[in-house]
Amino acid sequence: MAIVVRLDDLLYERRMTLTELAERIDITLANLSILKTGKARAIRFSTLEAICQVLQCQPGDLLEFQPYLGEA
Protein backbone atom coordinates (compact mmCIF):
# COMPACT_ATOMS: atom_id res chain seq x y z
CA MET A 1 0.00 0.00 0.00
CA ALA A 2 1.07 3.58 -0.54
CA ILE A 3 -0.02 6.91 0.84
CA VAL A 4 0.10 9.61 -1.83
CA VAL A 5 0.49 13.24 -0.76
CA ARG A 6 -1.46 15.54 -3.08
CA LEU A 7 0.13 18.76 -1.84
CA ASP A 8 1.27 19.85 -5.31
CA ASP A 9 -2.27 19.59 -6.65
CA LEU A 10 -3.75 21.58 -3.77
CA LEU A 11 -1.10 24.29 -4.02
CA TYR A 12 -1.67 24.58 -7.77
CA GLU A 13 -5.44 24.85 -7.34
CA ARG A 14 -4.98 27.60 -4.76
CA ARG A 15 -2.20 29.37 -6.69
CA MET A 16 0.13 29.17 -3.70
CA THR A 17 3.81 28.33 -3.56
CA LEU A 18 5.41 25.83 -1.22
CA THR A 19 7.43 28.69 0.27
CA GLU A 20 4.28 30.69 1.01
CA LEU A 21 2.64 27.70 2.67
CA ALA A 22 5.76 27.02 4.74
CA GLU A 23 5.75 30.61 5.99
CA ARG A 24 2.02 30.58 6.77
CA ILE A 25 2.15 27.36 8.81
CA ASP A 26 5.55 28.13 10.37
CA ILE A 27 7.37 25.01 9.20
CA THR A 28 10.70 24.84 7.40
CA LEU A 29 10.64 24.66 3.64
CA ALA A 30 12.87 21.57 3.86
CA ASN A 31 10.38 19.68 6.05
CA LEU A 32 7.44 20.68 3.88
CA SER A 33 9.38 19.60 0.80
CA ILE A 34 9.96 16.16 2.35
CA LEU A 35 6.22 15.85 2.87
CA LYS A 36 5.44 17.05 -0.67
CA THR A 37 7.75 14.51 -2.28
CA GLY A 38 6.23 11.66 -0.29
CA LYS A 39 9.45 10.93 1.61
CA ALA A 40 8.00 11.75 5.04
CA ARG A 41 7.50 8.76 7.30
CA ALA A 42 5.04 10.58 9.56
CA ILE A 43 3.16 13.86 9.92
CA ARG A 44 2.11 15.54 13.14
CA PHE A 45 -1.59 16.18 13.53
CA SER A 46 -0.78 19.82 14.31
CA THR A 47 1.03 20.14 10.97
CA LEU A 48 -1.80 18.40 9.13
CA GLU A 49 -4.31 20.69 10.83
CA ALA A 50 -2.31 23.81 9.90
CA ILE A 51 -2.01 22.73 6.25
CA CYS A 52 -5.72 21.98 6.04
CA GLN A 53 -6.61 25.29 7.66
CA VAL A 54 -4.46 27.36 5.28
CA LEU A 55 -5.47 25.39 2.17
CA GLN A 56 -9.10 25.14 3.32
CA CYS A 57 -9.23 21.41 2.72
CA GLN A 58 -9.86 18.14 4.52
CA PRO A 59 -7.10 15.63 5.38
CA GLY A 60 -8.55 13.30 2.75
CA ASP A 61 -7.97 15.99 0.11
CA LEU A 62 -4.28 16.00 1.01
CA LEU A 63 -3.64 12.29 1.61
CA GLU A 64 -4.77 9.44 -0.62
CA PHE A 65 -4.43 5.70 -0.09
CA GLN A 66 -3.44 3.68 -3.16
CA PRO A 67 -3.03 -0.08 -2.76
CA TYR A 68 -0.18 -1.71 -4.60
CA LEU A 69 -1.20 -3.77 -7.61
CA GLY A 70 -1.80 -7.37 -6.69
CA GLU A 71 -2.82 -6.65 -3.10
CA ALA A 72 -6.22 -7.86 -1.99
Predicted segments, located by residue:
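Residues within the helices of the helix-turn-helix
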Residues: 8, 19, 49
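A short, Lys/Arg-rich alpha-helix, primarily the initiator
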Residues: 1-16
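Short alpha-helical DNA-recognition segment
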Residues: 16-34
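Residue-level recognition of specific faces of alpha-helices
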Residues: 31-34, 47, 61
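Short, basic-rich loop-to-helix N-cap that marks the start of a DNA-contacting helix
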Residues: 39-50
